[in-house]
Amino acid sequence: MQNIFENCSYHSKYEPYFLNCTNTTNQCVLIQDVGIIQAIDFWANLCIPFTLFVIAFILNGYYLSILIPEFRKMNDTTKKQYIFVVSRGISSLSASSIMMVLRLLKMLSTSFTVYFLFFLIDDLSFYSLLGSYVGSTLLLYLATVRPIFYSIQISVRIVYKFALVNVLLAVVLAVTTAIFQAAEVSDGFFHCDVQHCQPIINIAMFVIIATSFLIPIITLTFVLVTLCFQKSRTQSIGNFTVDNSVYKSARTRLAWTLFTFTLISLTEMIPSSFLVNLRVEDTITICVNFYQADHLFIPAIMNSFQTLAWGIALIVDPLCALLFDPRIRKVWVEHVSRLSIIIGRSFEACCHSNLNKEIQDK
């Protein structure tokens, strides 16, 4: 059989996959496009996201190492404000760790069961994270706008129950979406073909993703606007009993949270809406997709952009908590002070040791 790429000035390691794709005269350009797409997938969907998820894992781990001991010291009134915050931190930590592992699984041939379990944990982390955002936002709203109702009617037990409901709903959604996602990348108890099954899955995933993100965004926007109006109202009626620092801290945290959520939602819904209208015949190793390789740049970029944004969002969330939560900020500032003292003493001891050695040599 004649090699269709033998006269090309550019040669790729992917040529053996497409030797039978003879129904084109533009094979030299198309094989270059395949190489570019694979490079985009390697760097923007594997290497860079893996680095971001490692950073997110370290930040969330450090944040939880501060938050959990502080949470244990809190009284019941303060704990009500931090139950969903702890849940959010745990979800972010597990999400970043699972996303790291999934990047590595893409390099291996894995069974449906393994993919399902990892997608299940991954989706469970993200859906519980979304619910934690909603829960913590509503509690923040009640604590600042309706403090009497919050202190009398909302007990720690009620907040724990809402947190449990959030986890149960996340489990139901995660099982559903994990089955769909695993069926796309590996054959399981049912086969998802690209002509009939995948379009339905794309639509279902788009509806689930859009609903999951719109609810937190609407909640965050409502509470943020309400807090701004509440501040103006208290100032206009001359109510100086309300601590303005409370409103300022709440608005700052909500603004950063809303920014993070908007970033996540856009990077989830835009690619998902694009995939709903995209018809893919089969995997990229099939001739049909080889012939349209020059049209696959946008799907590759969309998929990579989605992953990168999740990595950034998982970094922004604990970083905002470390910077804007006074209780957490106080602890890590003490850690930095102690570390600087230890480094200073170590440097001083090293200098003295070198100086004594020079004196002895003389």
Swiss-Prot record:
Keyword Glycoprotein recorded: yes
Extracellular side: 1-47, 103-125, 183-204, 277-295
Keyword Glycoprotein: yes
GO MF terms, alphabetically ordered: G protein-coupled receptor activity
Keywords in alphabetical order: Cell membrane, G-protein coupled receptor, Glycoprotein, Membrane, Receptor, Transducer, Transmembrane, Transmembrane helix
Top-level taxon: Eukaryota
SUPFAM superfamilies reported for this sequence: Family A G protein-coupled receptor-like
Subcellular location(s) of the protein: Cell membrane
GO cellular component, as recorded: plasma membrane
Ranges annotated as spanning the membrane: 48-68, 82-102, 126-145, 162-182, 205-225, 256-276, 296-316
Cytoplasmic side: 69-81, 146-161, 226-255, 317-362
Gene3D superfamilies xrefs: Rhodopsin 7-helix transmembrane proteins
Entry-listed glycosylation sites: 7, 20, 23
Membrane topology note: Multi-pass membrane protein
Family, as annotated: Belongs to the G-protein coupled receptor 1 family. B0244 subfamily.
Official protein name in the record: Putative G-protein coupled receptor B0244.5
Source species taxonomy: Eukaryota, Metazoa, Ecdysozoa, Nematoda, Chromadorea
